Every structure is written in structure tokens, then in C-alpha cells.
Amino acid sequence: MKIFGYADEGLPVEAVVSAELAEITLVASTDELRRIAKFLESCAEGMEARGRSWEHEHLSDKDRSFEGSAHFVVFNPEWGQRYTGSE
């Protein structure tokens, strides 16, 4: 697993460059943590069901209560990889 992110510096989206992070801290209530866990479980199920065709999902798209929060995105590391027939 890798974690990427960027600081909210008010830059236009085309000027934003993600960086690999060594640590993240979630400042969240117990209810928010449970909703995030549900989102992560849903992402895992989507990846299992759709394989390489499942690209990514935004938490705020699945749970509108996170619309004003920092962007939380899960990305499939196998997305777009060609099937080699050896799997």
C-alpha cells in the first residue's frame, strides 16, 4: 500500500502535484471512522468483483456527508494492467 497526497495551497487542479506520504492522521469521530470503514469495504468488494476495470472511488461520492472534507480516494493499483493469461 502506498499513500499519496498534497497540501491544500489553493492551486488550480492542473498545478497540483501529488507526493508519496510517510504517514497520515485521520482526525475523525467514531461515526466517521465507521462510515470510512464501510466505504473501504465497498471499495474492496468492487475491486474483487470488477478486477482491473475498477479504477478508483471517492469517499464523498459514496457518502455525501464528506463533501466538505479533504478528498479521500481509493485507487486500484492493478487498474488498466493487461491480462497476461498467467493469473
Where are the regions that the model predicts?
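Positively charged, low-complexity terminal tracts
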Residues: 1-87
